[in-house]
UniProtKB/Swiss-Prot annotation:
Cytoplasmic face residues: 1-139, 197-201, 248-271
Membrane topology of the entry: Multi-pass membrane protein
UniProt xrefs under InterPro entries: Yif1_fam
Protein function: Required for fusion of ER-derived vesicles with the Golgi during ER-to-Golgi protein transport. May be involved in proper membrane localization of Rab GTPases.
Alphabetical list of Pfam families matching this protein: YIF1
Broad class of the protein's primary localization: endoplasmic reticulum
Subunit structure comment from the entry: Component of the yip1-yif1 complex, composed of at least yif1, yip1 and yos1. The complex interacts with the ER to Golgi SNAREs bos1 and sec22.
Protein species of origin: Schizosaccharomyces pombe (strain 972 / ATCC 24843)
Superkingdom, natural source: Eukaryota
Primary gene name: hrf1
Compartment annotation: Endoplasmic reticulum membrane; Golgi apparatus membrane; Cytoplasmic vesicle, COPII-coated vesicle
Gene Ontology CC annotations of this record: COPII-coated ER to Golgi transport vesicle; endoplasmic reticulum membrane; endoplasmic reticulum-Golgi intermediate compartment; Golgi membrane
Protein name as annotated: Protein transport protein yif1
Length: 293
């Protein structure tokens, strides 16, 4: 029979302070055993000198932003609204190809009248069809892409001639924007003096002023042949094609004959003046294209 074991008993009293138990739970980070200090959420208002003053400042800033948005919407919303811009960028691949061929070979086109979008309820005209549904409708996609391609192509040709500089991008782009702006303002002034007004006229004029870059791209590409007579021939042909294209395309705006025109009824004297103005727009393309080439 094994002997009985006796455990030693403490012979002195244990202080109460050493028997204190920490009842607060502190989470550990992973398996390292280190405690993660508790972080209290910061109060943003504690850092502000006066919360009432800050709220007043925020409210004034919000009111100023809302007033600015309302002013822009009232004065420029009718030209630069999202709905109108979406109309000019509603294109398809087949439309882009057909439109480029129309700009280069406008002589083959027979009908230049724009299609009207009819209401499904009473059949009344609600506006013009988007470019994807009407080849004669102006768009913003081709002018913007042609503008960008024209700038890049000129810089690339300068690089082939060891004459490229980084500043050339800005110079070419600024020059092209200035020419387009001058043409747009001159055309807009002529429309104002002749009392020519139609819906979405501003965006239409901007779109038509950018189609000339298609001919300028072909003119720049012809320089790769290093034969001056080829470049002159391409430039002259593209000028005639662009002028004829604008002459037929702008007719619906300058000489309104549809129900979408605001002032469709004009006298014979006004009509003759508008025809001269239309030919002036077409003839002036040779000057703008020469400056940009």
């Amino acid at each position: 029979m094994p002997p009985k074991l006796y455990h030693p008993q403490p012979t002195h009293a244990i202080p109460v302070s050493n028997m204190r138990v920490n009842t607060r739970y502190e989470p550990t980070a992973g398996f390292s055993g280190t405690s993660v200090p508790s972080v209290q959420a910061a109060n943003p208002s504690a850092y502000l000198p006066n919360s009432a003053t800050a709220q007043m400042g925020f409210q004034l800033g919000k009111n100023a932003v809302n007033a600015g948005q309302e002013y822009v919407e009232q004065n420029f919303g009718k030209w630069l609204s999202t709905t109108r811009l979406h109309h000019y960028f509603t294109v398809t691949n087949s439309y882009v190809v057909a439109k480029l061929l129309l700009i280069i070979f406008p002589w083959r086109r027979r009908s230049w009248a724009r299609k009207l979008r009819r209401s499904e309820i009473n059949g009344s005209a609600e506006g013009y069809c988007p470019p994807a549904e009407d080849l004669n409708s102006p768009d913003m996609y081709i002018p913007l892409m042609a503008f960008t391609t024209h700038i890049l192509l000129l810089c690339a040709l300068a690089g082939l001639q060891d004459d490229f500089q980084p500043e050339l991008f800005g110079l070419r782009a600024s020059k092209a924007c200035a020419v387009v702006l001058v043409e747009f303002l001159a055309t807009r002034l002529g429309c104002y003096l002749l009392n020519i007004s139609s819906q979405s006229q501003v965006l239409d004029l901007l779109a038509f002023s950018g189609y000339k870059f298609v001919g300028l791209i072909l003119t720049s590409l012809s320089k790769l042949f290093e034969m001056p007579w080829v470049t002159r021939f391409v430039f002259l042909y593209m000028y005639l094609a662009t002028a004829f294209f604008l002459l037929r395309s702008l007719k619906y705006a300058v000489l309104p004959e549809s129900t979408m025109a605001i002032n469709a009824t004009i006298t014979s004297h006004q009509r003759s003046r508008r025809i001269y103005f239309l030919f002036f727009i077409a003839a002036s393309q040779i000057l703008f294209m020469y400056v940009l080439s």
